[in-house]
Amino acid sequence: MAMFDEDVGCDATPQLLSRRGALLAGLAMAVVVQPAMSRPHKGLRVLFICQSGTAKSAIAREVFRRRARQRGMAVTVFSRGIVLADHVSPPLRRKLAADGIDPAADPATVLERRDWQQADIVVAFNPLPGEVRPLHLRDWSSLGSLNDDYARARPDLDRRIEALLDEIASDDRRASP
C-alpha cells in the first residue's frame, strides 16, 4: 500500500516517506498555507483623509493599495478630503508618475459621516473637523509635504504604510484559530 499515487512518482510506504516525498509534501503545504495566512481581515476598510483629498490621502491610498495587493491582503482602501482642491503640483505629478502612482485613480471625494463611520481604520494627515470622531484613528499629521520634499516624505510615508500593514497582518494572525 503506497501513501501517494504511483503516477506522482513517490513510492513511500505508509510508515516512511522518502526525502523527496517529504520535501514535496512540505512544499505543497507551504504553497497552500502561505496565501491563506497572508490575507488578513477580508473586508477591512482603511480610510485616508487629508485636507484637499488629492495629495497625501490619495497618494497614500494608492501606495497602500499596491503594497496590500503585493502581500495578498484583501482590504478596501479609500481616501477623502475635508475641502477638495487639487494640491498635486506638476513636479510632484511627474515624480509620482515615475513611481507608477496615480493619485487620480479614484475621483477626489469630500469626506462624509458614513465614510469614517464605515472605516475600520482611519488615517488622518490633518486635524479633523470636530464632528469626525473615528474609533480607530491614526494621526499621521507629522508627515512632511510630498510637494515640497518628496525625497524625504515618500520614504516616511512608505515606512508608515508598511508598519500599518504589519499591524493588520499581526492582528489577523492573533485572531485566527
Region spans (language model):
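A short, aliphatic-rich alpha-helical micro-motif
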Residues: 116-117
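Conserved active-site segments centered on acidic
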Residues: 39-112
